[in-house]
């Protein structure tokens, strides 16, 4: 039993609030335990220079943490004049994940920017951002089709992500901050809706882990994202 009382294969309570932002084409406030992330998807007709006149679109992402999202105030990166390596890594992960589930040709010469702002951080912010961003992107695509800006749906898959780790020699699902900060192994799994993997990030924090332990984490992650896919579908089908 974990400090939170959860079983090793148990996710934290999850909720998805649709369209909390009135100006973005799509938005979602995802809450996974005490990790809360505001995700939005905004449409633009300007694409990166390397895509001009190619009739192909692009999806990019930005990620940030509000100053009050952590136990000690987190300084705004804009004030410091540069983004941290962690921020750049996470927003690139979100961007390439979303591009993997979109037919960029069908998107046309358009760009969608995914914005992920962490309101409260208690572990798993990047995986929550990916799971919430899919919902925001889905809503944005739906809005663009309703407005006849898009004639064909470019979404070709679903996506969700979850963290796993080895904590006190036991594989566990969906680590909170206390578990993450003391875990022997920390990993993130990003899955497409068809069961294929999009990305795996895994790091031994204290000691190397075995192939058997990796496969145990993979099994936990597959079961966890299945629950996330189900929740995404429930909220989107009920619109």
Curated annotation (Swiss-Prot):
<protein>
    <recommendedName>
        <fullName>Ribonuclease PH</fullName>
        <ecNumber>2.7.7.56</ecNumber>
    </recommendedName>
</protein>
<dbReference type="InterPro" id="IPR027408">
    <property type="entry name" value="PNPase/RNase_PH_dom_sf"/>
</dbReference>
<dbReference type="GO" id="GO:0000049">
    <property type="term" value="F:tRNA binding"/>
</dbReference>
<keyword id="KW-0808">Transferase</keyword>
<keyword id="KW-0548">Nucleotidyltransferase</keyword>
<feature type="binding site">
    <location>
        <position position="86"/>
    </location>
    <ligand>
        <name>phosphate</name>
    </ligand>
</feature>
<dbReference type="GO" id="GO:0000175">
    <property type="term" value="F:3'-5'-RNA exonuclease activity"/>
</dbReference>
<feature type="binding site">
    <location>
        <begin position="124"/>
        <end position="126"/>
    </location>
    <ligand>
        <name>phosphate</name>
    </ligand>
</feature>
<comment type="function">
    <text>Phosphorolytic 3'-5' exoribonuclease that plays an important role in tRNA 3'-end maturation. Removes nucleotide residues following the 3'-CCA terminus of tRNAs; can also add nucleotides to the ends of RNA molecules by using nucleoside diphosphates as substrates, but this may not be physiologically important. Probably plays a role in initiation of 16S rRNA degradation (leading to ribosome degradation) during starvation.</text>
</comment>
<keyword id="KW-0819">tRNA processing</keyword>
<dbReference type="Pfam" id="PF01138">
    <property type="entry name" value="RNase_PH"/>
</dbReference>
<dbReference type="InterPro" id="IPR018336">
    <property type="entry name" value="RNase_PH_CS"/>
</dbReference>
<dbReference type="GO" id="GO:0006364">
    <property type="term" value="P:rRNA processing"/>
</dbReference>
<comment type="similarity">
    <text>Belongs to the RNase PH family.</text>
</comment>
<comment type="subunit">
    <text>Homohexameric ring arranged as a trimer of dimers.</text>
</comment>
<dbReference type="InterPro" id="IPR015847">
    <property type="entry name" value="ExoRNase_PH_dom2"/>
</dbReference>
<keyword id="KW-0694">RNA-binding</keyword>
<dbReference type="InterPro" id="IPR050080">
    <property type="entry name" value="RNase_PH"/>
</dbReference>
<keyword id="KW-0698">rRNA processing</keyword>
<dbReference type="GO" id="GO:0009022">
    <property type="term" value="F:tRNA nucleotidyltransferase activity"/>
</dbReference>
<keyword id="KW-0820">tRNA-binding</keyword>
<dbReference type="InterPro" id="IPR036345">
    <property type="entry name" value="ExoRNase_PH_dom2_sf"/>
</dbReference>
<dbReference type="Pfam" id="PF03725">
    <property type="entry name" value="RNase_PH_C"/>
</dbReference>
<dbReference type="InterPro" id="IPR020568">
    <property type="entry name" value="Ribosomal_Su5_D2-typ_SF"/>
</dbReference>
<dbReference type="GO" id="GO:0008033">
    <property type="term" value="P:tRNA processing"/>
</dbReference>
<dbReference type="GO" id="GO:0016075">
    <property type="term" value="P:rRNA catabolic process"/>
</dbReference>
<dbReference type="InterPro" id="IPR002381">
    <property type="entry name" value="RNase_PH_bac-type"/>
</dbReference>
<dbReference type="InterPro" id="IPR001247">
    <property type="entry name" value="ExoRNase_PH_dom1"/>
</dbReference>
């Amino acid at each position: 039993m974990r400090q939170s009382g959860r079983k090793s294969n148990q996710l934290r309570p999850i909720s998805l609030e649709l369209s909390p932002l009135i100006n973005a084409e799509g938005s979602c406030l995802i809450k996974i335990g005490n990790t809360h992330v505001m995700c939005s998807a905004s449409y633009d007709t300007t694409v990166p220079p390397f895509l001009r006149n190619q009739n192909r679109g692009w999806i990019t992402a930005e990620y940030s943490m509000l100053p009050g999202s952590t136990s000690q105030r987190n300084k705004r990166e804009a004030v410091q004049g540069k983004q941290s390596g962690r921020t750049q890594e996470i927003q690139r992960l979100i961007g390439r994940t979303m591009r993997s589930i979109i037919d960029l040709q069908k998107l046309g010469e358009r760009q969608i920017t995914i914005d992920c702002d962490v309101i409260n951080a208690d572990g798993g912010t990047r995986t929550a951002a990916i799971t919430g961003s899919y919902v925001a992107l889905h809503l944005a695509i739906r809005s663009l089709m309703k407005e006849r800006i898009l004639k064909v749906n470019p979404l070709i898959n679903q996506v969700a992500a979850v963290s796993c780790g080895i904590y006190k020699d036991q594989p566990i699902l969906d680590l909170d901050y206390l578990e993450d900060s003391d875990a022997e192994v920390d990993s993130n799994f990003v899955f497409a809706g068809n069961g294929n993997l999009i990305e795996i990030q895994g790091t031994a924090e204290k000691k190397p882990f075995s192939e058997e332990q990796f496969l145990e984490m993979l099994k936990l992650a597959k079961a966890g994202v299945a629950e996330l896919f189900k929740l995404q579908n429930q909220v989107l089908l009920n619109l």
